[in-house]
Amino acid sequence: MITDPIADYLTRIRNAIRARHRIVEIPASNLKKAMTELLHEKGYIKQYKFDDQPNKQGSIKIGLKYNPGTKTSPINKLERVSKPGLRKYVKASELPSVLNGLGIAILSTSKGIMSDKEARQMKLGGEVLCYIY
């Protein structure tokens, strides 16, 4: 049984990037789907596909993106911030800036999963799930 599904999600992506895999398959949940859509929207992953099966959990297949010349990923680090044992909540005025705007913080807000920039524009605070840069 996985006690922290977000940490598992980030670890699977991190390990696949280090092993230079093109595709990584992850057990699906609504939170992971929203995070995957955000990563695609921000250009960190190439593509994704949700394999929903009736009466089963389903999975998410993520196509990882690499620079053709240097063969490096746009994702250098995936860092879990809010953990099950210690949640990290921030107000709209205290939203973090990751690498002076070069990275993103993924937040869970009352309006759903969004990046720090979107939350700043909407003046929303929430739980800081992770940093990606």
From Swiss-Prot:
GO molecular function, one term: rRNA binding
PROSITE patterns: RIBOSOMAL_S8
GO annotation, biological process: translation
GO cellular component, one term: ribonucleoprotein complex
Lineage top rank: taxon: Bacteria
Matches recorded under InterPro entries: Ribosomal_uS8, Ribosomal_uS8_CS, Ribosomal_uS8_sf
Record carries keyword Glycoprotein: no
UniProt keyword list: Ribonucleoprotein, Ribosomal protein, RNA-binding, rRNA-binding
Keyword Transferase: no
A Pfam family annotated for this UniProt entry: Ribosomal_S8
SUPFAM superfamilies (UniProt xref): Ribosomal protein S8
Signal sequence bounds: none
Family of the protein in this entry: Belongs to the universal ribosomal protein uS8 family.
Matching HAMAP family: Ribosomal_uS8_B
Subunit structure: Part of the 30S ribosomal subunit. Contacts proteins S5 and S12.
Function in brief: One of the primary rRNA binding proteins, it binds directly to 16S rRNA central domain where it helps coordinate assembly of the platform of the 30S subunit.
Record's protein name: Small ribosomal subunit protein uS8
Organism field: Amoebophilus asiaticus (strain 5a2)
Gene that specifies this protein: rpsH
